[in-house]
Amino acid sequence: MAKGKDVRVTIILECTSCVRNDSKKELAGISRYITQKNRHNTPSRLELRKFCPYCYKHTIHGEIKK
């Protein structure tokens, strides 16, 4: 049986460059990835370098609140 809260939680990673450069109107949107993290191993917010199809380069994607 499971004890307490689930250890693995689903998180959303959002491109930090697209959020800051929102003034550009040619951008079609903001890149987001859905993944999971282990709450015990990574209690702080997760940041990963992922490919952003709107910036056309690898950028830092940070964890956002649901």
UniProtKB/Swiss-Prot annotation:
Keyword annotations: Chloroplast, Plastid, Ribonucleoprotein, Ribosomal protein
PROSITE patterns, A to Z: RIBOSOMAL_L33
Which coarse location class applies to the principal site listed for this UniProt protein?
plastid
Which BP terms does GO give this entry?
Answer: translation
InterPro entries of this UniProt entry?
Ribosomal_bL33, Ribosomal_bL33_CS, Ribosomal_bL33_sf, Ribosomal_zn-bd
A single GO CC term, please? ribosome
Give this protein's Gene Ontology molecular function annotations. Answer: structural constituent of ribosome
Gene3D superfamilies, per this entry?
Ribosomal protein L33
Q: Which residues cross the membrane?
A: none
What NCBIfam families does UniProt report for this protein, alphabetically? PRK00504.1, PRK00595.1, rpmG_bact
Q: Which family does it belong to?
A: Belongs to the bacterial ribosomal protein bL33 family.
Q: What protein is this chain from?
A: Large ribosomal subunit protein bL33c
The coding gene here is rpl33
